[in-house]
Amino acid sequence: PVHPVLRLERLADDLIVSQPTFDQMTDAFTATLATARARGVVSFKSIAAYRTGLQIDAPDPHAARQDFRRLKETAAQTGRVRLAHKALNDYLLDLALTAAARQELPVQFHTGFGDSDADLRLANPLHLRRVIEGYPATQLVLLHSGWPYYRELAHLAAIYPNVWLDLSLAIPFATTGIPAMLRDVLGMAPFSKVLFATDAFTMPEIYWVAARWGRWGLTQVLDDFVHAGFFTAAEAHQAAQAILADNARRLYPIGAEP
């Protein structure tokens, strides 16, 4: 089954172009978010790591309005915009985090490595501490293991109830490093907070490789834990079931799907 995820910055890009005033834009943004779950959306997603960085500040309405004005000037010339203005993006993320909590929807954040336009220094999940502590009712799914900051992300998942660690992209692109990454992640984060995913794209073969390598790495690590006496065989099976499927079923409003 496939379920939609609402991409926050893409929605903002469209509304900045289409709405004539700041207030109309934010009203339309809020209204779209407010009906998301009723329309089948299972999560919001932010790529602030690409656009403005993960050090998301408290909302500043005056600065956000100034950013909107600048972007409208760009839209008038080109017909499109790319929201890379920090004050406005931080302001809209505050609205989104609040709307997500009201609907019991998680919010995904890109963290760590990605395409060449991502500044890795701004993608460290530790930058999200203010958001994590400021929105305790919002479940935050930090994507891609935060690679190469996966130890930091595992620490956040261990100490904050609303932080989840998603393994996508690190599986499969960490390749031979997958077992080492999983060993460190599961040595710190509770397995009930770790989500198997791939972020596979374009070619079906990537999905196959990711599924195979992810299970290979997880099997290696859990076998080691059993042999070391940390887990029983039954506990290792429970951990694998949770990471591969059950945690996602608990987190996302997708029901008990096969």
How would you label these PLM feature ranges?
Residues P1-T26, A34:
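Long, mid-chain structured domain cores
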Residues R10, A48-Y50, T111-D115, G146-Y149, ...:
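Active-site-proximal loop/turn and secondary-structure-junction residues that shape catalytic pockets
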Residues D13-D14, R51-Q55, D115-A118, M203-I206:
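Short catalytic/ligand-binding loop motif for oxyanion handling, primarily in non-cytosolic enzymes
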Residues L165, F173-V226:
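C-terminal hydrophobic structural anchor segments
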